[in-house]
């Protein structure tokens, strides 16, 4: 199990990313638009820098929904490999069959 504080921190970051997504996208579009003047683009960059750091999607970490484990994360199931194995062996994941060859 991951520390509760790190899981909660990541949840807070996810909330901030969602909250500032529109504003961040607009400012990035202005900053990257080469038809605008350099002053306008620079102003957009400054406003972008004023946004909270944790509102950047880069700062999010994919974590297991069950254990909070940050590594060995499968995007399709939003779980770590360990949780997938445990739930799969119990038959709790529909369509998941143990492989044998």
UniProtKB/Swiss-Prot annotation:
Pfam families tied to this protein: Ribosomal_S14
Disulfide bonds: none
Entry's Gene Ontology molecular function annotations: rRNA binding; structural constituent of ribosome
Taxonomic classification: Bacteria, Pseudomonadati, Pseudomonadota, Alphaproteobacteria, Hyphomicrobiales
Annotated GO CC locations: cytoplasm; small ribosomal subunit
Protein name: Small ribosomal subunit protein uS14
Annotated family: Belongs to the universal ribosomal protein uS14 family.
InterPro entries on file: Ribosomal_uS14, Ribosomal_uS14_bac/plastid, Ribosomal_uS14_CS
This protein's record includes keyword Ribosomal protein: yes
GO biological process: translation
Keyword rRNA-binding: yes
Superkingdom of origin: Bacteria
Assembly with partners or alone: Part of the 30S ribosomal subunit. Contacts proteins S3 and S10.
Function of the molecule: Binds 16S rRNA, required for the assembly of 30S particles and may also be responsible for determining the conformation of the 16S rRNA at the A site.
Keyword annotations of the record: Ribonucleoprotein, Ribosomal protein, RNA-binding, rRNA-binding
């Amino acid at each position: 199990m991951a520390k509760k504080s790190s899981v909660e921190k990541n949840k807070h970051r996810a909330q901030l990313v969602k909250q500032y997504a529109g504003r961040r996208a607009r400012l990035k579009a202005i900053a990257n638009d080469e038809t605008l003047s350099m002053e306008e683009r620079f102003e957009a960059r400054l406003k972008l820098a004023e946004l909270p750091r944790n509102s950047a999607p880069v700062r999010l970490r994919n974590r297991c929904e069950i254990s909070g484990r940050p590594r060995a994360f499968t995007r399709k199931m939003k779980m770590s490999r360990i949780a997938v194995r445990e739930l799969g062996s119990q038959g709790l994941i529909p369509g998941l069959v143990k492989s044998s060859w």
